[in-house]
Structures are given as structure tokens and as C-alpha cells.
Curated annotation (Swiss-Prot):
Lineage of producing organism: Bacteria, Pseudomonadati, Spirochaetota, Spirochaetia, Leptospirales
Chain's gene name: thrS
Compartment(s) where it occurs, according to its Swiss-Prot or TrEMBL record: Cytoplasm
Annotated source species: Leptospira interrogans serogroup Icterohaemorrhagiae serovar Lai (strain 56601)
The name this protein goes by in its record: Threonine--tRNA ligase
Domain (TGS): residue spans on this chain: 1-62
GO molecular function annotations of the record: ATP binding; metal ion binding; threonine-tRNA ligase activity; tRNA binding
Length: 638
């Protein structure tokens, strides 16, 4: 008999020879049709068909958990691979991972050996996938030696699989299959193909094998999968709605920003976009001031010795830009924290002045492959709303709780009301002591629990220097965006020998907290554009008011109104072009101005304004002072 301990600490006994599926059907029947895999002791993830072989803490993974979701999507990638090879007998499969960001949730890179495949072929491939689902094949697993695996895939002409096997350090590999078809995979997978009922192929592109342009060009097919048609339909609606809201399209229409061939991945902010950018920065700056943050600025270019000292050289080298100055190596900063730590180290510190909260709108540069650049969402230069807090260890929990409150205050200001929060734990490639990681992770959990905030766990997805809280905001069409983070860092204070003098006169090491709320201003602005569909609330809108003249006779009156609104602190544009008023209105609607003032002779004679709110066709006649008062009230209440 074996003992399995559930998350609620209850212990269940399992007979020898039972599979995890048997266990769930007997002890947790309400999960029978939802279970996709199990996780043992917070680490090992297994198929339901595996036999129980030891005492363990067990979690049942469903689609609603990230690891269950990943299992589902990866199984759908296998479904795609099987369908493709059923239809294209010479096709060679390479890799089919799950992805968080992209035109799908999974993809498979395929060498079609000369066959041309386009989106027009998707219905045919999807029909074959449907057949496999209806057949409801049990998913089987087999462990073989590397030698056996190589011989098997050699017979099939699968050269990419052989190359992958050669790079696997262990002497055994696992193979997963459905019916007679199989693929190299470490798993886990769903129990049977019939579970994968609702899917859609979403995009196609080219990709080099191993992202090396000297290797073969492959065809990358993307897809998504859901447990139900309702969820798939909802997702497809989101995609169609997202196309209308694409920040690249709206940004061009509103003349907010552009990208130039002279600087791919480097945003150019136009006057209207700069207004928006500055509005976000000024708001957060004012909120930081209320909370005792001190703003700093650090250099963009710093010695490579600094990056070696901080650990970024070893952990981030491939994403950095380098230059030579006076025959020494320098780098554009990919992160702001080392420079901030130099400022901390510049002075002696007493426990009386801690916690010390530094804030920086720091511009950073990170090298991204050209193929992954995507508007403001994936760029090579961006500005982080960074904060670095240095505190005694016993202040860690209270500081984290204050940051949690701060973060939600900011998000609610922008109209976000639904959130998902995660704790990302220690990755394989990390620095620091085990006890520090355990303490920091425990503190993050306790902070969220005391605030009554539910959270999920992202195993192994923390930063190399410490665990973190990730804040995800849900936008107006139901998409989740990961934005803010709170990261605990014991490593950098150690590396930079940071200290403070405690009440007993002894030197102590502070803990360092990295905090960002927007994440990056560029990406957050992209999210806001799509969330609001460019229809920004008045307080941040770059196009608050547009004044449109009906005839030339009212030009002087319009200029007088324009000057009064400018003097009152509003963002206003004056359109006195010799165009029909209908054309001017259409242009203003495209610019998504909050208010249109349509001024004709009647308004001039009565010293009033014909006001049209965004999204409405009716106009209201207001006095000039009444309109200004309304605007001021609207901004105050936002």
C-alpha cells in the first residue's frame, strides 16, 4: 500500500498496481472527467496512466491549472503532428512546444520536404485532427534506450528527432503515441485523444531549425485547444476583437508612435504618444512621492565588470548590447538594479533610514530576435517603472504588502478590476542560498494570504536572483496581461557588499526588493490602447478636445476658445481647415477625441459651445465656463 497526501492534508491509501487514474476515479470522482495529469511533491509531473510507486504529496492537474493547461496544449501539438504526418507522408517533425505569447498556445515546426502548406490547408488538417479525436485513441508511453530510439527514428527518416536524441544526456528516452503513430517526448500527456475536442489552427510562419539561419527553413503551424466549444468560441471572439483593437493599427491612426527601418524594435514616440507616455509617468511619480520613494537616474552605459559582478553577464549575456570605450568593454544596461545598488553603496546607511525606496524610470535595452518583435509588446528598448527597496529582513513582509496595495491602486485607476496573481519560484539556473529562497518564497505567500488574494504557483519561473509575485490584469475583452512584479533579492546585496548599521552597531545585510507596476511603459501603453480601443479616459487622453469651425467667420472666436482651454491646462487642437464639417468630424472620430466643439455663427453670437461627446451624435449647448468646470470635475473623479 502507498499513501498519497492531498493538498488539504488528507491522506489516502492506494493499493499496489493502481494507476493515478484509478486513484482519482475511486477517491476523487468529481475530478474524473477533468484530470489531465498529476504532480508529485511539487516537482514531478506524471501521466494518469502511470502506476503509483511511492508515497507522495499529490496534486491533480486540470485545465484551470497552468501545468494542466500546458499538458493539454502540448497534447494538442501531438494531435497536430499526427494529423500532418497522416496527410503528408514525407513530413518530418521537429519540436512542438507550448507558448504563452504568440498567435497560438502551441506550435509545431515541420519540414514538409518541399510540399507547400498555407492557411488554405488548415481545414484539411483540422478535419484529420477531428478524425483522431473521434477515434479517442488512448495515449501510450514507452521508455526505450537512446540506441533503440535512434534506430526507430532512422527507419522513419526523422533526422531532426535523431539530432534531438543525440543531445539528451540520459541513456533512456520516452516515446508517446496514439494508435500506431508516435513521437519523441518527455510528456506528460492527456489520457486519450478524445479529450482534445475543441481546437483551431491559427497561424503559419517560417522558422529556422534551432533558430539558426544557416539551418533548414521549417514551417511553423500554430494552434489553440480548449476543453469545450464554448471556450474556443469565446477565444476566437477575443481574437477578432483584438484585431480591431490592435495597438499598432490604432497607434498609427492616432499618430502616437512609429517604428522606422533605421531602428527596428526601437519605438519612436510622436507628440501625441509622448503626451500619453508622460501622463503615465507623471501619475506614477506622484503616487511614488506619496509613499516616500526617492527618484533617481542611472547611466545607460556601464562597465562590463559591473554586469559580471551583478550576475547579469552570466545569466543575460545573449540579450545585451556591447561597446568598447577606451579599449574597455561596456554594455547598454538591460536592467536598472545594478546602477541603483551603486547609488545605495555610495553612502553609509543606518537602520533608522530604512526601508530606503528608490524609484527610477529607467530606459533599458535588450536584444530580441527580429522575428519576435511585436509593436510595443516586444521591443528592444523600453522604460521600466522600476523601484528598488533596501530594507532589514524583518521589514520584508510589510514592504511587500504595501507594494501589493500600491499595485492594485494603480491598476484600478486605469479601470482594471479583475486580476490573477502568481508566485514564480526558484528556477533551475539561479543564485543564492536555499534558506534565503525558502524564506523569501514563504514571505511572498504569507503577504498575499494576509491580503486575502488568491494566487497560483509558477514552478521554476522566478528570476535568477529570487522568487517573485506576478500580477496579471484582465482587459476589456477578457485577455490576461502579466504586468507588475515584486521580486525578492538576497543575491545582489551580497554581490555588491551592501550593508547598514543596525541598532546594536553591527553591520547587517539588507534585503533588496525589485518592484515594477506597469512593467514597462511601452508595453503598458500598448495594453491600454487595446483595452480602451484608443478611447482613453480624459485624464490621460492625448486628444482631449478638438475645436472644429463650421465657417471661416468663426475662426477668431474658435482661436479665443482654444486659448482659454489651453490656459486652463487642457490638451486641445484647433481645426480651421476649409473643409466640410462632416469631414472634420470624421477625422476627429478617427483621432478618438474625447470632446468635439463644433463652432458656428450661432455659438459665436451667444458665446457658447456646441459640445459633442465621443461616441455620441447629439450635441449639447454649454457655456464656456460650464464646459471647463465639467472637464475639471471629470478629471478629478477619474
Amino acid at each position: 500500500m502507498y499513501q498519497l497526501t492531498l493538498p488539504d492534508k488528507s491522506i489516502k491509501e492506494v493499493a499496489s498496481g493502481f494507476t493515478y487514474r484509478d486513484f482519482i476515479e475511486k477517491e476523487l470522482p468529481f475530478l474524473k472527467n477533468k484530470a489531465l495529469a498529476v504532480r508529485l511533491n511539487g516537482e514531478e509531473i506524471l501521466d494518469l496512466s502511470r502506476t503509483v510507486e511511492k508515497n507522495s504529496n499529490i496534486e491533480v492537474l486540470t485545465y484551470s491549472e497552468k501545468l494542466g493547461w500546458e499538458t493539454f496544449q502540448h497534447s494538442a501539438a501531438h494531435l497536430l503532428g499526427m494529423a500532418v504526418q497522416n496527410l503528408y507522408k514525407n513530413a518530418n517533425l521537429t519540436v512542438g512546444p507550448v507558448i504563452d505569447n504568440g498567435p497560438g498556445f502551441f506550435y509545431y515546426d515541420i519540414d514538409f520536404q518541399g510540399a507547400i502548406v498555407t492557411p488554405e490547408d488548415f481545414p484539411k488538417i483540422e478535419a484529420e485532427m477531428e478524425k483522431i479525436v473521434k477515434a479517442d485513441h488512448p495515449v501510450w508511453r514507452k521508455v526505450v534506450s537512446k540506441k533503440q530510439a535512434i534506430e526507430t527514428f532512422q527507419k522513419l527518416g526523422e533526422k531532426y528527432k535523431i539530432e534531438i536524441i543525440d543531445g539528451i544526456p540520459s541513456e533512456e528516452v520516452s516515446i508517446y503515441g496514439m494508435g500506431e503513430w508516435f513521437d519523441l517526448c518527455r510528456g506528460p500527456h492527456v489520457p486519450n485523444s478524445g479529450i482534445l475536442k475543441s481546437f483551431k489552427l491559427t497561424a503559419i510562419s517560417g522558422a529556422y531549425w534551432k533558430a539558426d539561419k544557416n539551418n533548414s527553413m521549417l514551417t511553423r503551424i500554430y494552434g489553440v485547444a480548449f476543453p469545450t466549444k464554448k471556450e474556443l468560441d469565446q477565444y476566437l471572439f477575443q481574437i477578432e476583437e483584438a484585431k480591431k483593437r490592435d495597438h499598432r493599427k490604432i497607434g498609427k491612426e492616432m499618430d502616437l508612435f512609429s517604428f522606422q527601418k533605421e531602428g527596428p524594435g526601437f519605438p519612436f514616440w510622436h507628440p501625441k504618444g509622448t503626451i500619453l507616455w508622460n501622463s503615465l509617468a507623471e501619475y506614477l511619480r506622484s503616487e511614488c512621492n506619496k509613499r516616500g520613494y526617492q527618484e533617481i537616474k542611472t547611466p545607460a552605459v556601464l562597465s562590463s565588470e559591473l554586469w559580471k559582478k551583478s550576475g547579469h553577464w552570466d545569466n543575460f549575456h545573449e540579450n545585451m548590447y556591447f561597446t568598447d570605450i577606451d579599449e574597455e568593454d561596456y554594455a547598454l544596461k538591460p536592467m536598472n538594479c545594478p546602477g541603483c545598488s551603486l547609488i545605495y553603496k555610495h553612502h553609509l546607511h543606518s537602520y533608522r533610514e530604512l526601508p530606503l525606496r528608490f524609484a527610477e524610470f529607467g530606459s533599458v535595452h535588450r536584444h530580441e530576435l527580429h522575428g519576435v518583435l511585436h509593436g510595443l509588446f516586444r521591443v528592444r528598448a523600453f522604460t521600466q517603472d522600476d523601484s528598488h527597496i533596501y530594507a532589514p529582513l524583518d521589514y520584508l513582509e510589510s514592504e511587500v504588502m504595501d507594494i501589493i496595495d500600491f499595485t492594485f491602486t494603480v491598476y484600478k485607476k486605469f479601470g482594471f478590476s479583475e486580476f490573477k496573481t502568481f508566485i514564480a519560484t526558484r528556477p533551475e539556473k539561479s543564485q543564492g542560498k536555499d534558506e534565503d529562497w525558502e524564506f523569501a518564497t514563504s514571505t511572498l505567500k504569507q503577504s498575499l494570504e494576509k491580503k486575502g488574494i488568491p494566487y497560483g504557483i509558477k514552478e521554476g519561473e522566478g528570476a535568477f536572483y529570487g522568487p517573485k509575485i506576478e500580477f496579471n490584469i484582465k482587459d476589456s475583452i477578457g485577455r490576461l496581461w502579466q504586468c507588475g512584479t515584486i521580486q525578492v533579492d538576497f543575491s545582489m546585496p551580497e554581490r555588491f557588499d551592501l550593508d547598514y548599521t543596525d541598532s546594536d552597531g553591527q553591520k547587517k545585510r539588507p534585503v533588496m526588493i525589485h518592484r515594477a507596476i506597469y512593467g514597462s511603459l511601452e508595453r503598458f501603453i500598448g495594453i491600454l490602447i487595446e483595452h480602451y480601443e484608443g478611447k482613453f479616459p480624459l485624464w490621460i487622453s492625448p486628444n482631449q478636445i478638438r475645436i472644429l469651425t463650421v465657417t471661416e467667420k468663426v475662426t477668431d472666436y474658435a482661436k479665443n476658445v482654444y486659448r482659454e482651454l489651453l490656459d486652463s491646462g487642457f490638451r486641445v487642437e484647433l481645426d480651421t481647415r476649409n473643409e466640410k464639417i462632416g469631414a472634420k468630424i470624421r477625422d476627429s472620430i478617427l483621432k478618438k477625441a474625447n470632446y468635439l466643439l463644433i463652432l458656428g455663427e450661432k455659438e459665436m453670437e451667444s458665446n457658447t459651445l456646441a459640445v459633442r461627446m465621443r461616441g455620441q451624435e447629439d450635441t449639447k449647448i454649454l457655456t464656456r465656463t460650464g464646459f471647463i468646470s465639467n472637464l475639471q470635475d471629470e478629471i478629478k473623479s477619474s
